[in-house]
Amino acid sequence: MKKRVAKFVRKCFLTHGKSTTNPSSIHSLIPVRSGDWDTAPAGTAQIDTVAHCGHTLAGDFIYTVNATDVPTLWGARRAQLNKGQTATVTSMEQMEKGVPFSIVEWHPDSGSEFINWHCKEWCENKGQQLTRSRPNHKNDNCFVEERNGHIVRRWIGYTRLDAMEVVAALNFVYDVLTPYLNHFVASRRTVSKERVGARWKVTREKRSKTPYERVLERSDVSETVKTKLRLEHETLNPLTMKREIDRRLQVVFSLQKHCGIPKLEK
């Protein structure tokens, strides 16, 4: 009798609880990207958001939507207030206009600003694929994650930006900063990486190249696009652009100082 009662008591205690949350159906419809990035065609863009929140996530603040084409490292970025679905798609539309070739795939992380029905339908209507990273795997989006730091954070910094007036001013900065980086700032890509003992041996390209040069080398980019880029490149002056970027950045921080929310900047 004692054994029967003990067995009954054990069954009263469940080994696991019941979940009251169902997985979002949108995640099952947007595929997780698999495969080698080295074989990706031009127009395969990783995309992410950078929060200009300062020391607190309280209240409204500005985000930068940052995108990087994986094969060419061609970048595009726009500023928006908060990261709502409509605002994010509007930023993606504007960034697409600044990319000289057609976008064939957008690859964000699992953030709700990108993984939603509005963004999915927008991509489908344009004939573009929307894929996503594995949750909690930041390295799946490594190209744009890297540029979140050494482009957005390096140029804009960590200051809180929360004034509506600053959105237009920050986009005014990106109007010059983006072509400056694409045409004149070179980088060396990693060719191989192997472990030797306790260290990693990293082999990089022998010569640094700008995104502009990488586009010209691509066989999957049309000659019409390349000719248009060459003509644009001839009209640009890096020294003049750098001075203009600095001037526009001063406007951004001046507007934030006068129009921002002081109590949230601390």
Residue ranges and their predicted role:
Residues 1-105, 110-266:
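Secondary-structure boundary/capping micro-motif
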